[in-house]
Regions:
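Short loop/turn microsegments at loop-to-beta-strand junctions
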Residues: 7, 38, 104-105
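Conserved short beta-strand elements that form part of the metal-binding/catalytic scaffold
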Residues: 30-65, 116-121
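Short secondary-structure junctions
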Residues: 28-34, 82-85
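N-terminal beta-strand motif that seeds the catalytic metal site of vicinal oxygen chelate
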Residues: 1-17, 59-61, 120-127
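Short amphipathic alpha-helices within nucleic acid-binding modules
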Residues: 69-74
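Conserved active-site tyrosine of GNAT-family acetyltransferases
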Residues: 19-24, 75, 114
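Vicinal oxygen chelate
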Residues: 2, 80-127
Length: 127
């Protein structure tokens, strides 16, 4: 397995409205959605999602994988320690980020310098 598709980049934002104005109005990013609380704003840059958050780390790099459980197990077999197993992050009932009814799953880990990285995947909600 090779992690070669950036799915999302998370960046700290001290003021969400100021961030919306800057990224949408000045940089031309497509605004996706604002969740406040908890203090999240999402944009799309040609297929790469950018998350601005008021209470997160300075930056997090998310890698898209087709099968998060397999990718998680493969990286664990290479000695990577995860902060937690894959977990449900968002149930997309309205289709804000993809098809309605899909779930977004993530598993977070760190690089040797302590930078936060994540695996990300979507799957249909189990019925």
């Amino acid at each position: 397995m090779k992690l070669d598709q950036i799915h999302q980049i998370a960046v700290y934002a001290r003021d969400l409205d100021e961030a919306i104005s800057f990224y949408r109005d000045k940089l031309g990013a497509r605004f996706l959605h604002k969740f406040d609380p908890p203090g999240l704003v999402f944009f799309d840059f040609s297929g790469v999602r950018v998350l601005l958050e008021k209470t997160g780390p300075k930056a997090t790099l998310y890698f898209w994988v087709d099968d998060i459980d397999s990718a998680y197990e493969e990286l664990r077999s290479k000695g990577i320690e995860f902060l937690h197993a894959p977990q449900l992050i968002h149930r997309d009932d309205s289709g804000v980020f993809g098809k309605p009814g899909e779930e977004e799953w993530m598993a977070f880990f760190s690089d040797p310098s302590g930078n936060v990285l994540a695996l990300a995947s979507r799957r249909l909600e189990d019925v």
